[in-house]
């Protein structure tokens, strides 16, 4: 019996798990490195808790296999990495408010900038801390999100250089359509970015790191590599869409699994799940219950649509996905018992299949795996 004061690992033996293969992460990074060459920097994007895989563990695997630096969305994510002892350069992609500038400085991050107010705040906080903060100017070449108009880049860069406690480390932009087979707009964006870089050079403004390539850029647009690439989804072994090339062979790193928790036989005419949206038509239908639902990141839109794998065989989901449980028809599989493993996605059942059934992308599925699901690293 556990006694007071002892640490209890409640996650140990948890039925529903996300199994993360760090060897696959390392292999994917190595493949990206081979693709881009040794002369360019590789920034591993580990925002959203490493796309749901675990930012700290993914970061360590990436850095051990050829990544030079990391990227997060917000300073809080960078702080978590610093607390874990990760000391490499970390860029925060998100545009923070001036009142949050202290977070970037405190966590020793590099910060995306495209507003004078944020520049002033970063300069002030850096001066207070007695440090210099690296910044990367974001240029909007067609994403329509954050970033300066290209024609404002030179003036803004001059303002950065006038801030005594800031260092212009990089200038970058982001593709909006590079994961589509038609690269016309991506090439338009690339042209705008090149002209912006040319204007900065003509103005005598040095830019140490120029970067634009996301995962789709790495795969399909080598002319966008510049000084550094920023792969995200492909680190995790997933392609950004079905329209990109497979110029880098990738191994999916995550498998989402659970175990059967209950099995029973029911007669024809038995309603299954909330709303009674499924009613059995055969006698002696064997129904297995699994302890995973939409709170774990298994979308409710999979109700009456998805299949899972039990003992190597695909079986259908019966009825609605509930918050914590789902039911399966395992009649075709002999002797299914509580404790038998179930694959929700992974080998033999790609996450893209799940995403397609609910009308979304693989990114959303893996980043949506719930926080109560332990990540198990192999």
Across the structure, where does each feature detected by a protein language model lie?
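Active-site anion/phosphate-binding pocket segments in diverse small-molecule metabolic enzymes
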Residues: 1-22, 26, 30, 34, ...
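Active-site-proximal beta-alpha core segment in soluble small-molecule metabolic enzymes
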Residues: 4-12, 16-20, 24-27, 40-211
